[in-house]
Amino acid sequence: MIKVALVAAVALAPVAWFALAPGDASAPSPAEIAASAPPGDWIDIPESELLLMETAEGGRVVIQMASEFAPVHVGNIRKIAAARWWDGTSINRVQDNYVVQWGDATERKTLPEGVIAKPAAEYFRPVKGLSPDWIDWPDPYAKRTGFWKGWPVGGDGDNIWLTHCYGMVGVGRNLAPDTGSGAELYAVIGHAPRHLDRNIALVGRVIEGMEFLASRPRGTGDLGFYTDGQQRIAIGSIKPMSDAEAGAKSRYQYLSSKSFSAYRDARANRRDPFFNVPAGGADVCNIPVPIRRAS
């Protein structure tokens, strides 16, 4: 049975999504559009793109990696996860309305063999050869924004990059030229800090279990770091989904095709009965791509 993980599961018979007037009682909400999308509009996320984080207290977090945007950093992360390097480390920083960050609090652990300690910057990539689904609404941080293979992106005509939307995962780093190895990761837990776009390597997004990151007590130190080691949240393990026990594995899908186009339009122009004035637009981070658990 298909279970919707991050989309409100509201059963609805297929209806015509377009040309609906504001306040139309028959207008579906974005969640209803996603819940009633045909199976063919859901695209499988390969298991090879998934990491499974389990906190020592039993929290489960699933991260999808973005290897087509930061291949070297993602390659590092795969090696780190496969070596179980993060097992026994901790969540060390929770900054309100910003990020939660995890890794080795001692900063003394030796990186696994084959990890590149100082990769080249992977903050954007050429757009040539790609066909993003651009949206028409203006954006203060990029000439254009849109989606590519389910990822929120910005672009300037020559290059394309991932955007710092809620739940996106990036690589912690020091001042340039440092780019971070991938051993320190963070997830966005607040209003999208888009000023970080093209300044840090974004390597993926949390697709399940954000509550185990975003609901943590806020750190009281500078930048939200915990000042007392007892406050840190222990990480039981972070491993490739392929290495998880059969009972812990799950498959995921993201919404695409015509259903996503209808969903995107509905996010920008709410026509369901509660809304009197459709906004007529939405920023890319206010159109979270629906992702569901498929098994």
Which residues does each PLM region occupy?
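Bacterial N-terminal signal peptides
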Residues: 7-15
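Cyclophilin-like peptidyl-prolyl cis-trans isomerases
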Residues: 14-295
